[in-house]
Amino acid sequence: MLNVEPSFAEELRSSGVSLSATYLGSVPVVESINVMVSEMRVQVVSECIQHVAATVGVTAAREINPVVSRVIGEVKKENFPVDINISSKMIKIIKQSRLIQRHPFSFFSFGAQGQKGTDTELMFGYIAKNKDGTDRRCHVVFIEDVHKLIDVLTTAINVNTFDAQANASTSNDGFTVPAPPMRHRSSLHRQSFVSNCRAPTVTEDVVGKVWYHGNLSREDAQALLKTEGDFLVRQSDHTPGKYVLSGRTAENEHKHLILLDNHNRVRTRDRTFSNISELIDYHVNNGMAVRSEGRDRETSLNLIRPVPCPGSDDIE
């Protein structure tokens, strides 16, 4: 059931809602959002907002997060007043009655507000491809009523999703037909839309843990794993947001297990956990090996000794 005022839903289906804003610019995002966990998506958009705003001179410049810097390109500066038109089908950015950007929701990936309590709080960034499905960018706007923008956009996405499901369930001749496979539906079914008010994610609790090393390459991780049972958790330096459990087996082999599946769930072969810390604690406290099934064979890691991250305490 669509929990939206009917007249508002019809407005979104027809002319859409227009809001005045300042279009600051955009920056290419070369990495697919689908491979990133939720907090990494937020971090990418937050860094893009800050980077674009600093480039056009409306905020102070600061160093970009090194992980994010690998997945974004050069800023395209704009900084002019626009109207943002949001309908149930797309987002349009209009300058002096001329359409300059059009992003159908089928190519919309992710959006987030600027960081609260900073000079980007009234800014909003969203990642989308253009109308022909190419040129993935984070587009950044400044808008006084940023919360209204978020509310309208969230509602438009809900209407779009509802309409797509309704159209999929009934054929033109009135007979009920199966819904299409998920890959053929609007990509909104697979995307998260966030503001600063969001629930904690499955990976946020790793920060500060003695065994968490942050961004670390496979080679550097292996150099730290000296004996059987040594383990650490790291974030891949090649794929932002991919969390990996690295350890050394009884056969003195290095193993690297991806901790999140395609739905951002923390899983092993045997069970699902609410977060990464729960997975680590469960296997350490019970003396159980972490088991994961690969294409060729099962991988098993005993978690005996956490390798402490430099600068962390040896005891949590």
Curated annotation (Swiss-Prot):
- Which segments constitute the SH2 domain? 211-307
Annotated segments matching region Disordered = 292-316
Main subcellular location: cytoplasm
Keyword Cell membrane in the entry? The reply is yes
One of the GO BP terms on file: positive regulation of axon regeneration
Q: Where in the cell is it found?
A: Cytoplasm; Nucleus; Cell membrane
The PID domain, residue ranges: 16-158
Phenotype when changing residue 136 to K: Partial sensitivity to Cu(2+). No effect on the association with mek-1
Under PANTHER family, the record lists: CRK-LIKE PROTEIN (PTHR19969:SF5), SH2-SH3 ADAPTOR PROTEIN-RELATED (PTHR19969)
Q: What is this protein called?
A: SHC-transforming protein homolog 1
Q: Which organism is it from?
A: Caenorhabditis elegans
The major lineage groups are: Eukaryota, Metazoa, Ecdysozoa, Nematoda, Chromadorea
State the gene name recorded for this protein: shc-1
